[in-house]
Amino acid sequence: MADQLTDDQISEFKEAFSLFDKDGDGCITTKELGTVMRSLGQNPTEAELQDMINEVDADGNGTIDFPEFLNLMARKMKDTDSEEELKEAFRVFDKDQNGFISAAELRHVMTNLGEKLTDEEVDEMIKEADVDGDGQINYEEFVKVMMAK
């Protein structure tokens, strides 16, 4: 899995990894994993983090070494880039299947994910992604936002 990463990606991950490997022992604690991944532009949920940690932390000691971390990031990046997964995610947001994500649909999904957002926050998220300015997010705009993560 990690062999599909470019040298640039590997050195970027190594740099981020060592920022959080405070004592330089080659391991990071599980609670630091989320921070590391967010610093690399990934945005895992708590549930995703727990799943990833469970997959990697076989002995349950709460730490992850660099090779395990690389495999994790490679897997996460592969998932993120998958066209089918993007379409599926878009369909989850686009409740009425009209090809657009409205503010109401975005708020609904985010609430279901446990993210209670104000109207202003929802509007801001829409505005950030809404390239053509129609007040909704179409599939192309959605993909652009997801790929930028």
Curated annotation (Swiss-Prot):
Record-annotated EF-hand domain positions: 8-43, 44-79, 81-116, 117-149
Keywords for this protein: Calcium, Cytoplasm, Cytoskeleton, Metal-binding, Repeat
GO molecular-function terms, A-Z: calcium ion binding
Binding-site residues for Ca(2+) 1, renumbered to this chain: D21, D23, D25, C27, E32
Location in or out of the cell: Cytoplasm, Cytoskeleton; Cytoplasm
Residues reported in the UniProt entry to bind Ca(2+) 4: D130, D132, D134, Q136, E141
SUPFAM superfamilies listed in its UniProt record: EF-hand
A Pfam family of this chain: EF-hand_7
GO cellular component, one term: cytoplasm
Database matches in InterPro entries: CALM/Myosin/TropC-like, EF-hand-dom_pair, EF_Hand_1_Ca_BS, EF_hand_dom
Keyword Nucleotide-binding included in the entry's annotation: no
Additional record remark: This protein has four functional calcium-binding sites.
Function: Calmodulin mediates the control of a large number of enzymes, ion channels and other proteins by Ca(2+). Among the enzymes to be stimulated by the calmodulin-Ca(2+) complex are a number of protein kinases and phosphatases.
Name used for this protein in its record: Calmodulin-2
